[in-house]
Swiss-Prot record:
It comes from Methanothermobacter thermautotrophicus (strain ATCC 29096 / DSM 1053 / JCM 10044 / NBRC 100330 / Delta H) (Methanobacterium thermoautotrophicum). The keyword tRNA-binding applies. InterPro entries: Ribosomal_uL1, Ribosomal_uL1-like, Ribosomal_uL1/biogenesis, Ribosomal_uL1_3-a/b-sand, Ribosomal_uL1_arc. Belongs to the universal ribosomal protein uL1 family. This is Large ribosomal subunit protein uL1.
Length: 212
């Protein structure tokens, strides 16, 4: 299937009009024979793309002390201290803004109860509750992995729609990233990719191109 994916990716690039920004490349998977009313058929998985996402991903770290310092050194886009976390609890508008602005959150494990109290109401519904990490850990490997990570989820519709890179990435690398998403489908669905009704690729603003 990789050849078909590469050809579709190439066509999606050709059909996409030039924009004044680098567009993402998306994959859309329509699933058949899946009852999403059953909780066991819904999932929310994180997939590490072998060739990365092609653009920066904004990550916030909630931590104090040494972990906060290491997170800054590791290139975290935002570090939220305990005091700042408590302030966010009083400012729902700002908390929502941060929840929408940052794709992933990481939190010092012993601060998770406070995170749940002050940020849980805005992060929970967005499926962005932080990953807890020990205060003594070096967060750099975790942050590096998250920068290459996308969400693959099925909620109330039997459809997966996720980013797999950017339009300026090599066709083969994009195809390999799509394969990583398909491997998740193989693992999560009873019949794996045999349950694919159709698959499309597209740039952010471009038309869809059918793969299967």
């Amino acid at each position: 299937m990789q050849q078909e994916i590469m050809e579709a990716v190439k066509k999606a690039k050709e059909l996409s009009r030039p924009r004044n920004f680098t567009q993402s490349m998306d994959v859309i998977l329509n699933i058949k024979d899946l009852d999403v009313n059953k909780p066991e058929n819904r999932f929310d998985e994180e997939v590490s793309l072998p060739n990365g996402r092609g653009k920066d991903v904004k990550i916030a770290v909630i931590a104090d002390g040494e972990l906060a310092l290491q997170a800054k050194n590791a290139g975290a886009d935002l570090v939220i201290t305990k005091d700042e976390l408590e302030e966010l609890g009083k400012n729902r508008k700002e908390a929502k803004k941060l929840a929408n602005q940052y794709e992933f959150f990481v939190a010092q494990a012993d601060m998770m109860p406070l995170v749940g109290r002050f940020m849980g109401p805005v992060l929970g519904p967005r499926k962005k509750m932080p990953k807890p990490v020990p205060a003594t850990i070096n967060p750099e490997p975790i942050l590096n992995k998250l920068r290459d990570t996308v969400k693959v989820r099925i909620k109330d519709q039997p459809v997966v729609h996720t980013v797999v890179g950017t339009e300026d990435m090599d066709d083969e690398k994009l195809a390999e990233n799509i394969e990583a998403v398909l491997q998740t489908i193989d693992r999560k669905l009873e019949k794996g990719r045999n349950q694919l009704k159709s698959m499309y690729v597209k740039t952010t603003m471009g038309p869809v191109v059918r793969v299967i």
